[in-house]
């Protein structure tokens, strides 16, 4: 990742050098907190939006696009000014529905870092309909601004007029809000407990079938993922995808996976088979499944 980032950001530029130094200090995690953003903006006389635009090729470098070879980068800006990178993640030898879009990537990245509200989405290509619908699930969706290289300060709902969303199904819950499904993490295995805790934070008001993923890497690091459901159903994002996406954006190698645990309360639907199918194309490590 280090060399890819350096190729993306030519190191004969002082701003690029400063960005690389920030990323190096955090092991190449695709994230800049508010303080880092403000320092870069101050040092190089930039607005946060101009900095985000400059960072789009960098965000896109986190993509995995074995199918399309079309890299999309996105940056979700949290309400306190943190920058969450996102990139499209494709999975060869699996169903195309397993794909993670760049805006989904950035939002789920923010969610797993416990962001509660997105104010702006900066992306290098116009959001597709799938992503517009996914963003409409967010708390405060009507206030989100979309920024493209050729057009800034566009309300999300200008891309999604007469929008269908949670309110049409009498659902008050929104993605990124605090969730609690009363799932108890009392297993003897800590990795199972982490999967249960992730499931407990799922956003699944339509099926009430939460599930979570916990991935243990060989160095002892653990990455978790939560299920993000959508009013339109198909733009929903399973927990395995949110976990894999977070791993990619934090420079984790799937070859270093040691264990993968899934905890699920399958009331109306289950993601077990879908997760096993995708994992079989990525790793020889088998899914450990726990029914809640």
UniProtKB/Swiss-Prot annotation:
Highest taxon in the source lineage: Bacteria
Entry-linked Gene3D superfamilies: Cytidine Deaminase, domain 2 (3.40.140.10)
Active site positions, chain numbering: 103
Enzyme class, UniProt record, top EC level: hydrolase
Swiss-Prot/TrEMBL cofactor(s): Zn(2+)
GO molecular function: cytidine deaminase activity; identical protein binding; zinc ion binding
Record-annotated CMP/dCMP-type deaminase domain positions: 47-167, 186-292
Record keywords, A-Z: Hydrolase, Metal-binding, Zinc
One GO BP annotation of this record: cytidine deamination
Record: residues binding substrate: 88-90
Enzyme Commission number, as recorded: 3.5.4.5
InterPro entries: APOBEC/CMP_deaminase_Zn-bd, CMP_dCMP_dom, Cyd/dCyd_deaminase_Zn-bd, Cyt/Deoxycyt_deaminase, Cyt_deam_dimer, Cytidine_deaminase-like, Cytidine_deaminase_bacteria
PROSITE patterns in the record: CYT_DCMP_DEAMINASES_1, CYT_DCMP_DEAMINASES_2
Record note on cofactor: Binds 1 zinc ion.
Keyword field contains RNA-binding: no
A Pfam family: dCMP_cyt_deam_1
Task performed by this protein: This enzyme scavenges exogenous and endogenous cytidine and 2'-deoxycytidine for UMP synthesis.
Family, similarity comment: Belongs to the cytidine and deoxycytidylate deaminase family.
Protein name stated in the entry: Cytidine deaminase
Native species: Haemophilus influenzae (strain 86-028NP)
Organism lineage: Bacteria, Pseudomonadati, Pseudomonadota, Gammaproteobacteria, Pasteurellales
Underlying gene: cdd
């Amino acid at each position: 990742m280090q060399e890819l980032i350096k190729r993306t950001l030519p190191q004969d530029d002082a701003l690029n050098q400063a960005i690389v130094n920030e990323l190096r200090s955090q092991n190449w995690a695709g994230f800049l907190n508010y303080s880092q953003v403000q320092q870069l903006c101050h040092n190089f006389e930039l607005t946060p939006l101009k900095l985000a635009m400059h960072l789009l090729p960098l965000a896109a470098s986190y993509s995995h696009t074995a199918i399309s070879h079309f890299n999309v980068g996105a940056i979700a800006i949290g309400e306190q000014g943190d920058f969450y990178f996102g990139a499209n993640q494709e999975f060869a030898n699996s169903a195309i529905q397993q794909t993670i879009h760049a805006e989904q990537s950035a939002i789920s990245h923010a969610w797993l870092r416990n962001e509660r509200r997105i104010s702006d989405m900066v992306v290098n290509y116009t959001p597709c309909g799938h992503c517009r619908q996914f963003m409409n699930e967010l708390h405060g969706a009507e206030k989100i601004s979309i920024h493209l290289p050729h057009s800034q300060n566009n309300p999300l709902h200008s891309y999604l007029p007469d929008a269908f969303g949670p309110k049409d199904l009498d659902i008050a819950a929104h993605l990124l809000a605090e969730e609690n499904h009363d799932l108890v993490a009392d297993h003897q295995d800590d990795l199972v407990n982490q999967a249960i805790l992730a499931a407990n934070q799922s956003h699944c008001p339509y099926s009430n079938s939460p599930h979570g993923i916990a991935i243990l890497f060989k160095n002892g690091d653990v990455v978790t993922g939560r299920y993000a459901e959508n009013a339109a159903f198909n733009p929903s994002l399973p927990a395995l995808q949110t976990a894999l996406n977070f791993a990619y954006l934090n420079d984790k190698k799937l070859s270093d996976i040691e264990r993968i645990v899934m905890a699920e309360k399958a009331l109306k639907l289950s993601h077990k088979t879908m997760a096993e199918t995708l994992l079989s194309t990525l790793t020889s490590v088998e899914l450990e499944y726990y029914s809640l």
